[in-house]
A protein has these predicted regions:
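Alpha-helical transmembrane segments and their immediate juxtamembrane cytosolic regions
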Residues: 1-347
Length: 347
């Protein structure tokens, strides 16, 4: 984990004698939007919260299920813009940092944790597999990533995709961990999500503007249509990170990236998105602070008390929104204070 003064892409390029490359602020905005989604989903106030902010029980797709794939895709988008992404030491240090930080967060929430689980452990596993994929020649990268999805489909056909028995349950048990949406069985599919982000990052790096917008939009639409066409055979399932889930959520993320790139980077509409940009730049701080303070510390004491009082005064629906909205506001204030001081925390 590194704490460093904030620097623009132009400053960093100048420091190494490269032509300045403008920062694509739309990417930070999309990351920030994903962070807001995670905070709203993780810190929901009570059962009166809309169903779309609850994950699908098993098969199916809700807004809550799209949030994390968007975040993972943005992780991949950043790779082509990083001078250190290819370096083994830098990549492995990042993976280790994410895994350790994830272990600490899960331990703070539940009192114990297994290495490699939790949201940050999931990011670490997906990033590692994607980084290994990127060691291959570029044509082989695409072929291999495309081959992962049919492979996952075959596993589902052989071992099943039921809530009590699936190939994911079997793999996690063999690895000695409990089945969960963030357990190791989800790493291959989510690595493909990260790789889709890498491809999008290459498109943006090769030249932002109309051509990039067309490619991102066409690619996103094609993924959504293909994924939906597969759902009668391969159901949408976040907990298994099924092939159809990879395609549909990856397509949605690409379409969102195209829209924000057009608005923020091409049209220059920045001010309305500045709050999201702050959370996108300080994403690690936002997530860890929320998990520790609002999930580990306050959720068992303060949150129930506030929920009961607000429910009695304004009703359950108002109380359901108070806690998640308050968590976003407080987390944003912390991130904004750090950014004003030029402090950016990255892993």
């Amino acid at each position: 984990m590194a704490t460093r003064p904030a620097a623009s892409g132009r400053d960093a390029a100048a420091a190494v004698g490269q032509p300045p490359r403008p920062r694509l602020r739309g990417v930070d905005v999309l990351r920030g939007l994903a962070v807001v989604g995670m905070l709203l989903v993780d810190n929901r106030g009570n059962a009166a919260i809309p169903d779309q902010l609850e994950h699908a029980a098993w098969h199916g797709l809700r807004v809550a299920d799209v949030v994390f794939p968007v975040f993972l895709l943005v992780v991949g988008v950043s790779v082509p813009f990083s001078r250190r992404a290819d370096a083994p030491r830098a990549a492995l240090t990042r993976v280790l940092g994410l895994a350790v930080l994830g272990w600490l967060v899960v331990t703070a929430k539940y009192g114990s944790a297994t290495a490699g689980v939790g949201v940050l452990g999931h990011v670490a596993g997906a990033y590692l597999l994607c980084w290994l994929l990127l060691r291959l020649p570029r044509p082989a990268q695409v072929v291999t990533a495309a081959g992962v999805l049919p492979g996952l489909g075959v596993l589902g056909a052989v071992w099943g995709v039921g809530p009590d028995r699936s190939w994911g349950h079997t793999l996690d048990a063999a690895l000695g961990v409990s089945f969960s949406a963030e357990a190791p069985h989800s790493y291959p599919g989510s690595a493909v999500t990260v790789f889709l982000g890498v491809l999008a990052g290459r498109v943006l790096r090769s030249g932002a503007g109309r051509a990039a917008l067309v490619r991102l939009t066409a690619g996103g639409a094609a993924l959504v249509v293909t994924g939906l066409a597969l759902t009668p055979v391969v159901p949408l399932n976040k907990r298994l990170w099924s092939p159809s889930f990879v395609l549909v959520t990856g397509g949605i993320a690409l379409l969102a990236l195209a829209l924000l790139h057009w608005l923020v980077d091409v049209r220059g509409v920045v001010r309305p998105f500045r709050p999201l940009e702050v959370l996108g730049i300080e994403a690690i701080v936002a997530f860890v602070f929320s998990e520790v303070v609002f999930r580990a510390v306050l959720s068992g004491t303060v949150q129930p008390a506030v929920d009961g009082w607000v429910t009695s005064v304004a009703g359950a629906a108002a109380s359901a929104w108070l806690y998640p909205v308050l968590s976003v506001a407080v987390v944003w204030a912390v991130c904004a204070a750090l950014l004003r001081r030029g402090v950016v925390v990255r892993v």
